[in-house]
């Protein structure tokens, strides 16, 4: 019917606008970075639970480790490992505030198989333990 077609057209328009907005935001977010760095940032974010080695990240963008590390640091202001740690802790913080998953499970999900090490790294980034972070988030 005409109503159904109108609804589908409206839905399609909304989806196109949302997609266009997402693409624009993505372009703005990465506009200051070269293609190798953009690819690396995206790869890291989508593979946080994997073992992320600099040598493999450099290979993915066909660069030597030293050139890759220099480029990454120059463009992001962080070393590759600092960026990985920051992103892992950011993702862990999201899980801590939005889920009831056990801390150890969250640590493992973001790439830390050793729970003690995860707690140590998280505490270094957020100045609090994952458990305390969760409690503080729940109070808000």
Features from the language model and the residues they span:
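Short alpha-helical "packing" element that flanks the helix-turn-helix/winged-helix DNA-binding module
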Residues: 40, 44, 89-92
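An amphipathic alpha-helical interaction segment
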Residues: 1-42, 67-69
């Amino acid at each position: 019917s005409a109503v159904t077609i109108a609804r589908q057209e409206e839905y399609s328009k909304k989806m196109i606008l949302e997609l266009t907005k997402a693409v624009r935001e993505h372009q703005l977010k990465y506009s200051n970075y070269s293609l190798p760095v953009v690819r690396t940032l995206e790869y890291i974010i989508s593979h946080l639970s994997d073992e992320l080695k600099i040598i493999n990240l450099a290979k993915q963008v066909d660069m030597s480790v030293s050139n890759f590390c220099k480029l990454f640091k120059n463009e992001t202001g962080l070393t590759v490992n600092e960026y990985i740690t920051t992103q892992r802790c950011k993702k862990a913080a999201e899980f801590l505030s939005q889920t009831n998953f056990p801390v150890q499970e969250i640590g493992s999900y973001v790439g830390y198989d050793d729970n003690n090490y995860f707690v140590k790294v998280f505490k270094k980034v957020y100045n609090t333990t994952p458990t305390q972070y969760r409690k503080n988030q729940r109070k808000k």
